[in-house]
Amino acid sequence: MSTKNNSNVPEISDEEFYKNRLLTVTEQLKDNVQVYPHKYEVNYRFKDIFTFKDASEEDLKKVKVQSAGRILNFRIHARYSFFQVMSEDFTIQLVVDAQVLENKDIISNIKRGDIVGFSGVLGRTKTKEFSVFIKELSILTPCLRTIPTDYYGLKDPEIIYRKRYLDLLINKESKNRFIQRTNIIKFIRKYLDDKDFVEVETPLLNIIPTGAAAKPFTTHHNELKMNLFLRIAPELYLKKLVIGGMDRVYEIGKLFRNEGIDLTHNPEFTACEFYMAYADYNDMMNMAEEMLNGMCKYLHGSEKIVYAPNKREKEVKPVEINFARPFARFHMLEELSKVVGIKLDGLNINSDETLDLLIETCDKYEIKVEQPKTLTRVLDKLVGHFIEPKCINPSFIIGYPLVTSPLAKNHRSEAGMVERFELFINGKEICNAYTELNNPIEQRMRFKMQAQDINDGDDEAMITDEDFCVALEYGLPPTGGFGMGIDRLTMFMTDAANIKDVILFPAMKPESDN
């Protein structure tokens, strides 16, 4: 049996292929050919077709299907042609008999990447491959450009991030990673819904950029004639809802921070925050353990995972991460006391002498701290150097001085400290939580402390929100609050070494700027 020209991989350049295909489509449109039909009736999705895979030959012949998908590969022969068609996560073979097909010309017109509609009956070939034996075949959407082949794949990070649609078509690993991301969010929602939390939405455009220590994005509202800020955190809005009687609330949504981009930071990212009345940070720790342990078992069937990032980041070595409870705990000041040689506590940490000692320690270990060298910034750098690398398995860092946490409640037994923790996995922050400060008098004092840092040049210090202080005067019950970055968590759950690999369309410079 003779074989005609196989156009799986064009023998001409990509540009020539594009020009030729565009010319063909343009001429068809001029001739009023329906190149892009409005609709195509699908009576069986591919996953439904595959439910018949083990049926008998006699039963298969009774199943008439009409479906659609994208051409991956094909072989054209004198009479029989074979097309591999993909839809969602399934690929099926179409067997086309030129003597049966009404529109025979279509066979020579089909190119790799075309989206086709087809109808026929199910069956098996002589080699027992489950297939659809075609009666009708039509092109629903022509592919005007060449798609990279499975053999060579799509490996250039620039193309992967800028043309995610190609990445999803070619790299099954990428598609599975984003499906897992969806599963992670579904798990979080179900976990909170099952505990009677109510999902809410709070504004993305804020008058005051507060709720976290970060640089905001600025925009302008033409009608109101005022500048607004993209939210850096929904925290204060959510606590207002608790004041309003919504005892358990959560939000999953976008946050924006006008800061650097690296392997674990993107200026637009997704987070989950929840607030629970009559709870404290101990309850938040229990819930963090319960949620992450359950999520790991749900996604991987085990409490342990081997974080083996994708091969593009060759310097990242596989690491075993154990989500078994209880998670480890590191007290910030106790750990740093071992480094600086004196006992640090919530009282002496605020002295000028202690700050000088901490700065000297940074200099000794060549730890860079940007100006102004506030206590909060210095502690953050020291924790990042000495404590975070110990947190391979999920670990809580507790023991935060009051000055570092303007929205957290004073510690009930450690003077000068607050009831706060941050959860780290493989040395990266995933969660931040605390017993919420609900004393309006104390909250105003904390905001004044932050205002002093702003005056000293700290552009990440928190801005005073008087409206929130007024809301606190109506009474916020004892409350535990929790925030978690979904992108970083997804990285560890899906073997991604770069945060861009878990964000469908990450922030990128325009190609003309490169």
Swiss-Prot record:
<dbReference type="Pfam" id="PF01336">
    <property type="entry name" value="tRNA_anti-codon"/>
</dbReference>
<comment type="subunit">
    <text>Homodimer.</text>
</comment>
<dbReference type="InterPro" id="IPR034762">
    <property type="entry name" value="Lys-tRNA-ligase_II_bac/euk"/>
</dbReference>
<protein>
    <recommendedName>
        <fullName>Probable lysine--tRNA ligase, cytoplasmic</fullName>
        <ecNumber>6.1.1.6</ecNumber>
    </recommendedName>
</protein>
<dbReference type="InterPro" id="IPR002313">
    <property type="entry name" value="Lys-tRNA-ligase_II"/>
</dbReference>
<keyword id="KW-0067">ATP-binding</keyword>
<dbReference type="InterPro" id="IPR018149">
    <property type="entry name" value="Lys-tRNA-synth_II_C"/>
</dbReference>
<dbReference type="GO" id="GO:0005524">
    <property type="term" value="F:ATP binding"/>
</dbReference>
<keyword id="KW-0963">Cytoplasm</keyword>
<keyword id="KW-0436">Ligase</keyword>
<dbReference type="Pfam" id="PF00152">
    <property type="entry name" value="tRNA-synt_2"/>
</dbReference>
<dbReference type="InterPro" id="IPR006195">
    <property type="entry name" value="aa-tRNA-synth_II"/>
</dbReference>
<keyword id="KW-0030">Aminoacyl-tRNA synthetase</keyword>
<keyword id="KW-0648">Protein biosynthesis</keyword>
<dbReference type="GO" id="GO:0006430">
    <property type="term" value="P:lysyl-tRNA aminoacylation"/>
</dbReference>
<comment type="similarity">
    <text>Belongs to the class-II aminoacyl-tRNA synthetase family.</text>
</comment>
<dbReference type="InterPro" id="IPR012340">
    <property type="entry name" value="NA-bd_OB-fold"/>
</dbReference>
<dbReference type="InterPro" id="IPR045864">
    <property type="entry name" value="aa-tRNA-synth_II/BPL/LPL"/>
</dbReference>
<dbReference type="GO" id="GO:0004824">
    <property type="term" value="F:lysine-tRNA ligase activity"/>
</dbReference>
<dbReference type="GO" id="GO:0000049">
    <property type="term" value="F:tRNA binding"/>
</dbReference>
<dbReference type="GO" id="GO:0005829">
    <property type="term" value="C:cytosol"/>
</dbReference>
<dbReference type="InterPro" id="IPR004365">
    <property type="entry name" value="NA-bd_OB_tRNA"/>
</dbReference>
<dbReference type="InterPro" id="IPR004364">
    <property type="entry name" value="Aa-tRNA-synt_II"/>
</dbReference>
<keyword id="KW-0547">Nucleotide-binding</keyword>
<dbReference type="InterPro" id="IPR044136">
    <property type="entry name" value="Lys-tRNA-ligase_II_N"/>
</dbReference>
